Regions:
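Catalytic core of nucleotide-sugar-dependent glycosyltransferases
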Residues: 142-144, 197, 201-205, 210-236, ...
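A conserved acidic beta->alpha catalytic loop
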Residues: 25, 40-49, 66, 89
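Short aromatic/hydrophobic "clamp" motif used to bind/position activated sugar donors
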Residues: 85
């Protein structure tokens, strides 16, 4: 059997302060047959110089106009030569055995493997946390019930699967484009699970999911539901997905002490009563009461 080539697509935008660490984490892999495809989505800082400081023939750098990360990931996919493709944001890192574990899993399931997921740690305030829900098999059902627990860095797709199932390039969907793809792709393929924690998602204030413009967040989630509706989910399944989207909006509004969070929370509960028993709803209600009775904003 030939040695498996893995393509790592790294979209980036003004991440000169982070991307060096990201690249090093890939170059430090114990498995060495990979290519790094860095797609610079119109950076105005010195990202290019940081990338060029790594003299490694496995690194390819492409700069294009700013069109958001879905377009950048799709661009990188078109350039990828690997048997399998994975994605890594330019402020996250692989542990040094990440690719070795993935390739071992590929070899063990090579006859029918199309897409699989390896879990990751969340680095929050300097501490590694396990944020992946328990009992996520089958993944397709868990994506409906538990929301998006699949960060791009843990997803490996067969080259032709990635090429034929691209990220939605609607710019206003940015931030939910990965979840929309996982739901769409799970309707076509079985998503396998390799339960080895092998990468780190680093939480920081610059991350794009830290929304301050709630109107854009609401629009994004409404677009997400519009696109997801077209994937052929049953009415009960779609109501569960909708409940997750509405509760997400409610949480972010509550964290800003915005009382309109209540209306979104009620919509979430109306779609799926079980959402009441989740940590997200508990935190939402706690922050709304804190703001009302103490004036303290949540965090």
């Amino acid at each position: 059997m030939k040695q498996i080539l893995v393509s790592i697509v790294i979209p980036t935008y003004n991440r000169a302060d982070f991307i060096g660490k990201t690249i090093k984490s890939v170059l430090n892999q114990t498995y060495s047959n990979f290519e790094i495809i860095i797609v610079d989505d119109g950076s105005t800082d010195n990202t290019k110089e940081v990338v060029r400081s790594f003299a490694d023939s496995r690194i390819s750098y492409f700069k294009k106009q700013n069109e958001e990360r879905a377009v950048a990931r799709n661009y990188g996919t078109e350039k990828a030569k690997g048997d399998f493709i994975t994605f890594l944001d330019s402020d996250d890192v692989f542990l040094d055995f990440h690719l070795a574990e993935a390739v071992s899993f590929i070899k063990a399931h090579i006859s029918d493997l199309e897409i699989f997921f390896q879990p990751y740690y969340l680095l929050l305030e300097g501490q590694r946390k396990n944020k992946i829900p328990q009992k996520i098999i089958p993944i397709a059902k868990s994506l409906i019930k538990k929301g998006n627990f699949m960060a791009c860095q843990g997803v490996f797709l067969k080259n032709e699967v990635a090429r034929n199932n691209s990220f939605n390039e609607d710019r206003l969907l940015s931030g939910s484009e990965d979840y929309e793809l996982w739901l769409r792709i799970s309707r076509k393929f079985k998503i396998e699970y390799n339960p080895v924690y092998s990468s780190i998602l680093i939480d920081h204030q610059g991350r794009s999911q830290h929304y301050r413009d709630t109107s854009l967040l609401i629009l994004r989630k409404e677009l997400f539901l519009k696109y997801t509706l077209a994937h052929g989910y049953s009415k009960p399944e779609f109501r569960v997905i909708s409940s997750g989207a509405y509760s997400y909006i409610a949480l972010h509004l509550a964290l800003q002490s915005d009382n309109t969070a209540w209306s979104w929370l009620l919509k979430a509960i109306d779609c799926d009563l079980r959402i009441l028993f989740t940590k997200r709803v508990f935190v939402t209600i706690k922050n709304l009461f804190l703001a009302k009775f103490t004036g303290i904003k949540g965090s």
